[in-house]
């Protein structure tokens, strides 16, 4: 379960490339998934319960581009995942995460 994230490491470097830094690349899901061609890894993702959620309210705008880019990557690779957008009143804040986490845990039976 990923809540209100930024999934492209370039955001933290003013949208510049991260060069040859493999650690940064592997922690940039929007890039890593697009470039993943190993069927074994893709199958592992397909077997997982993946939920990615964002709000559309205050302080969420910085992560929206990478949210939608990651969603497109999952769709392209046929990796099932629940990409959920909450309303414009839903901010990047603990108040909302405390509501979202129990909601999603309950939704997957935990």
Regions found by a protein language model. Give the residues of each.
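Non-catalytic cap/lid and distal C-terminal segments of serine-dependent acyl enzymes
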Residues: 1-110
């Amino acid at each position: 379960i990923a809540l209100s994230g930024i999934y492209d490491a370039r955001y933290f470097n003013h949208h510049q490339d991260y060069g040859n830094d493999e650690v940064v690349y592997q922690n940039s899901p929007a890039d890593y998934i697009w470039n993943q061609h190993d069927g074994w890894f893709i199958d592992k993702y397909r077997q997982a319960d993946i939920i990615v959620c964002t709000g559309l309210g205050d302080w969420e705008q910085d992560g929206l581009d990478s949210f939608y880019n990651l969603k497109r990557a999952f769709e392209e690779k046929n990796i099932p995942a629940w990409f959920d957008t909450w309303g414009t009143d839903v901010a990047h804040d603990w108040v909302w995460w405390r509501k979202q986490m129990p909601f999603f845990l309950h939704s997957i039976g935990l």
